[in-house]
Amino acid sequence: MNPDDGKEAATWQTGIMKSLYENLSEPAPLEDGALRVIPLGGLGEVGRNMNVLEYRGKLLVVDCGVLFPEETQPGVDLILPDFSWIEDRMDDVVGMVLTHGHEDHIGAVPYLLKLRGDIPIYG
């Protein structure tokens, strides 16, 4: 196996994600009483499960898991959800609900808690 294969795959994935994000506009303001669901990981993959529920300006995190790399990604230990959407809104997070104890649902919790260590956790 060529060690550069993993780097090329990671670079390709990063390029795809950047091109997707560049074409996204800001979400529309929520109507009063509306609920927004924001998937930050776990779509189209087994792992990295994380969703954020937004309601009346407050955020509830549901799961915060890791994705384990494939053989084509040497040197990568874990793949985390994309926290960038909530990094600037950590003060709006009212809690985190963990649905169960598998790594793909709880493995990234310590990394999120580095952004704000006093988030209440429910399970």
How does the language model describe each region?
Residues H105:
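N-terminal Rossmann-fold NAD(P) dinucleotide-binding loop
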